From Swiss-Prot:
Protein family per UniProt: Belongs to the thymidine/pyrimidine-nucleoside phosphorylase family.
Lineage: Bacteria, Pseudomonadati, Pseudomonadota, Gammaproteobacteria, Aeromonadales
NCBIfam families: PRK05820.1, T_phosphoryl, Y_phosphoryl
Job of this protein: The enzymes which catalyze the reversible phosphorolysis of pyrimidine nucleosides are involved in the degradation of these compounds and in their utilization as carbon and energy sources, or in the rescue of pyrimidine bases for nucleotide synthesis.
Catalytic activity field: thymidine + phosphate = 2-deoxy-alpha-D-ribose 1-phosphate + thymine
Organism of provenance: Aeromonas salmonicida (strain A449)
Protein name: Thymidine phosphorylase
Gene3D superfamilies on file: Nucleoside phosphorylase/phosphoribosyltransferase catalytic domain, Pyrimidine nucleoside phosphorylase-like, C-terminal domain, Transferase, Pyrimidine Nucleoside Phosphorylase, Chain C
PANTHER family on file: THYMIDINE PHOSPHORYLASE
GO biological process: pyrimidine nucleobase metabolic process; thymidine metabolic process
Entry superkingdom: Bacteria
Gene Ontology CC annotation, any one: cytosol
């Protein structure tokens, strides 16, 4: 018999908790026998005293098992269950291309995604820009679309990792979000409840990243790789750059438009192409669908070239309630802003740095992201045709196109973009898209 307050005291004093103690506490969170005050106290104790890797594995597994864990065996899919998770950024529309590309190569991708958080865009908010697309469906519909299309991107259902929902809500209002142990548990409990065989983590680094420093990003990546493998899921991580907007656009509808153009071959921004290919290749290798990076990239390029990946995206959209001719007529289905105008730099020169976080907040300021949980979003607003680091700007070459609904919105976004993009006389060195890979051997 355990007492919640004794478990809290033990962690407060810096001792390691047993698997049984962690399971007891998480069960209490799930069945409401442990209150918000006790969750907050344990979260603060963990924030200050941390958790060993064994404790993190126990926490993740207990949170995963707090609800339903999807089982794919009865569907006889004939391919591996594999997924990707990103710590989020600005213009990070990778999931919309990656899911269909991996599915086209023989993987099955049951992707549980989130909404926008702070300055970062949410995959579900982007998909909400597609008329009729349902991000909230029951498990039967989810399984059916994954089986038929090979990929489905939906939101967390109430019966997947319910303990995480309660813990996260408390962490959010008690200044305990930044605990790497608890971030690890929160991310992985939801992902592992999807019944994955392999997972690839995309951990962002730079001015638009969730983690403030390269070292913190690396620490989170190592924690996730260690804990996920400890919980029985083959997992690796890539540290990728978020010192500039990743795609050419940032917003909801504008990013969906870019994803469709990428899949159909109409336009592929080279930076997001490299990040997408790197993550997809890592997934194919992890899922034993490719022998090495070169083999994986060959297969991925083939499904882009032959239209199979684009066709699968269309199938997923239709399966989740969207238009059956979305890929053919995407431009008429996606919302458009009243004002689309360029914003220019105050002086000519090279783009030397970007405050990517501030650029994300410019989209939020126009109504493309939330200030409060219940806010309704404007899916048409955003930024497109974004300048890249190292490129030159002048009176003819704008920083970006702003998609706004009013003149006031345009003016506010324009001044935020101008302040966030630094212009100098010397061209900076190019930054890599992918900094490093972290696998089990790197721990």
């Amino acid at each position: 018999m355990f007492l919640p307050q004794e478990i809290i005291r033990k962690k407060r004093n810096g001792e390691a908790l047993s698997t049984q103690e962690i399971q007891f506490f998480v069960q209490g969170i799930t069945n409401n026998t442990i209150g918000e005050g006790q969750i907050a106290a344990l979260a603060m104790a963990v924030y200050f005293k941390d958790m060993t890797m064994d404790e993190r594995v126990a926490l993740t597994c207990a949170m995963r098992d707090s609800g339903m864990v999807l089982n794919w065996e009865h569907l006889n899919l004939g391919g591996p269950i594999v997924d990707k998770h990103s710590t989020g950024g600005v213009g990070d529309v990778v999931s919309l291309m990656l899911g269909p590309m991996v599915a086209a190569c023989g993987g099955f991708v049951p992707m549980i995604s989130g909404r926008g958080l702070g300055h970062t865009g949410g995959t579900l908010d982007k998909l909400d820009a597609i008329p009729g697309y349902q991000t909230s469906v029951d498990n039967d519909r989810f399984l059916k679309v994954v089986k038929e299309a090979g990929v489905a991107i939906i939101g967390q259902t109430g019966d997947l990792a319910p303990a995480d929902k309660r813990i996260y809500a408390v962490r959010d209002i008690t200044a305990t979000v930044e605990s790497i142990a608890m971030i690890t548990g929160s991310i992985l409990s939801k992902k592992l409840a999807s019944g994955l065989e392999a997972l690839v983590m995309d951990v962002k680094v730079g001015s638009g990243a969730f983690m403030p420093t390269f070292e913190a990003s690396e620490e989170l990546a190592k924690s996730i790789v260690a804990v996920a493998n400890g919980a029985g899921c083959r997992t690796s991580a890539l540290l990728t750059d978020m010192n500039q907007v990743l795609a050419s656009s940032a917003g909801n509808g504008v990013e969906v438009r870019e994803a469709v153009r990428y899949l159909t071959g109409e336009y592929r921004n080279p930076r997001i192409h490299e990040v997408t290919m790197s993550l997809c290749a890592e997934m194919l290798i992890s899922a034993h669908l490719a022998s090495d990076d070169a083999d994986a990239r060959r297969k991925l390029q083939a499904v882009l070239d032959n239209g199979k990946a684009a066709e699968i995206f269309g199938r997923m959209v239709t399966g989740l309630g969207g238009p059956s001719d979305f890929m053919e007529r995407y431009d008429s289905y996606l919302p458009k802003a009243a004002i689309v105008r360029p914003v220019y730099a105050a002086n000519a020169g090279f783009v030397t740095a970007m405050d990517t976080r501030e650029l994300g907040l410019a989209v939020v300021a126009m109504g493309g992201g939330r200030r409060a949980a219940g806010d309704k979003l404007d899916y048409a607003v955003g930024l497109t045709d974004f300048i890249r680091l190292g490129q030159s700007v002048d009176a003819d070459k704008p920083l970006a196109l702003i998609h706004a609904q009013t003149e006031d919105q345009f003016a506010q976004a324009a001044s935020m973009v101008q302040a966030a993009v630094k212009i100098g006389d010397t061209q900076p060195q190019a930054l890599p898209e992918v900094y490093r890979r972290i696998g089990l051997a790197d721990l």
